[in-house]
From Swiss-Prot:
The lineage of its organism: Bacteria, Pseudomonadati, Pseudomonadota, Gammaproteobacteria, Thiotrichales. It comes from Francisella tularensis subsp. mediasiatica (strain FSC147). This is Uroporphyrinogen decarboxylase. Catalyzes the decarboxylation of four acetate groups of uroporphyrinogen-III to yield coproporphyrinogen-III. Keywords: Cytoplasm, Decarboxylase, Lyase, Porphyrin biosynthesis. One of its GO terms (cellular component) is cytosol. The keyword Lyase applies. Its EC number is 4.1.1.37. Pathway: Porphyrin-containing compound metabolism; protoporphyrin-IX biosynthesis; coproporphyrinogen-III from 5-aminolevulinate: step 4/4.
Length: 344
């Protein structure tokens, strides 16, 4: 197995950085769209281990990447807890009966029953890990981000229902977050048992929170998960909060091994605020891939020059969020080739 990705979490400074892409198995690839067309709905595809493996392999077959990520979705846990999940074209994920009260929370399945409904994810991990020669990244949504969809019922610009519960009924909110955290610990451990070499916790909506509420309603539970996972098995864990650059000082002493960085700050700024000892992952603006070949190469060169100038810390080159579905696959090749060229 190529271990450059895992080596980034070691103490030795690497000669070159590993690279992978958030949502690298996705709609921007025509081969992904061909597989997706075989299934009536997205979750049916997620439940098919062979399909998950096939689409996870697509980017590895096209590009020189140092890691794969299991093909799944962050909302597998809420669905396993008994919530009715549908993916609606033009809207995205929708829960028909969102959490609004303690009564709604009481209707959810137990942790044991919920975990038993997620075997299809572990099967996808096992099938994919046995088919690749690079590390496989497992993942989950953070409790706060999962709760955002479970309470709001769908994505939202303002998440008013979510934030209303946080302020008006914090006890109920914490009850939901704790249950999600307890399930997530087992969920990640099962992914590792099935073949994941590291895990990532995506906190997509943590960035909407004020600092103190981020600490109490989001980071607290991510740290709880990371500590409990590491008590069982010491694997690399990466925290990523979209829009979370204001929280770096709070994250630097937590149990994660790496921190995802979006494009709202430079890697230099992130390193200064997080300090030494954590791997930084990121942080290209996904939209930079709309640019010309020359502009892509120039942007890559600037980031690689900084990475090489830091003699103490390792970096994982990635986008600052998931790749957009209308990106030209050839632009991705330009980016990766430039990363390899300028890292040589």
């Amino acid at each position: 197995m190529r271990k450059l990705f895992l080596d980034a979490f070691g103490e030795k400074k690497l000669d070159k950085p590993p690279v992978w892409i958030m949502r690298q198995a996705g709609r921007y690839l025509p081969e992904y769209r061909a597989v997706r067309a075989k299934f009536d709905n997205f979750m049916d595809m997620c439940r098919n281990a062979d399909a998950c493996c096939e689409v996870a392999l697509h980017p590895l077959q096209r590009y020189d990447l140092d890691a794969a990520i299991v093909f799944s979705d962050i909302l597998t846990i809420p669905e396993a807890m008994g919530m009715d999940l549908k993916f609606i074209k033009g809207t995205g994920p929708v829960f028909s009966e969102p959490i609004q009260s303690q009564k709604d929370l009481d209707k959810l399945k137990s942790i044991e029953d919920s975990i038993g409904s997620l075997d299809y994810v572990y099967n996808a991990v096992k099938t994919t890990s046995s088919a690749i020669n690079v590390p496989l990244i497992g993942f989950t949504g953070s409790p706060w981000t999962l709760a955002a969809y479970m309470i709001e019922g769908s994505g939202s610009k303002q998440f008013n229902k979510l934030r209303k519960m946080m302020y008006a009924n914090p006890q109920l909110m914490h009850s939901l977050l704790q249950r999600l955290a307890d399930i997530t610990i087992i969920y990640l451990l099962e992914q590792v048992k099935a073949g994941a070499s590291s895990v990532m916790i995506f906190d997509t909506w943590g960035g909407i929170l004020p600092l103190e509420h981020y600490k109490n309603f989001s980071l607290k539970y991510k740290e709880y998960i990371a500590k409990n996972v590491k008590q069982k098995i010491n694997i690399p864990i990466v925290f990523f909060t979209k829009g979370g650059s204001n929280f770096f000082e709070e994250i630097k002493d937590k149990s994660c091994d790496g921190v995802g960085v979006d494009w709202s700050v430079t890697l230099k700024q992130a390193r200064h605020r997080i300090g030494v000892g954590k791997v930084l992952q990121g942080n290209f603006d996904p939209a930079f891939l709309y640019g010309s070949k020359q502009s892509i190469r120039e942007t890559v060169r600037a980031n690689i020059e900084f990475i090489q100038s830091d003699k103490l810390n390792n970096y994982i080159v990635n986008l600052g969020h998931g790749i957009y579905p209308d990106i030209d696959p050839d632009s991705v090749r330009v980016m990766i080739d430039a990363i390899r060229e300028f890292s040589a």
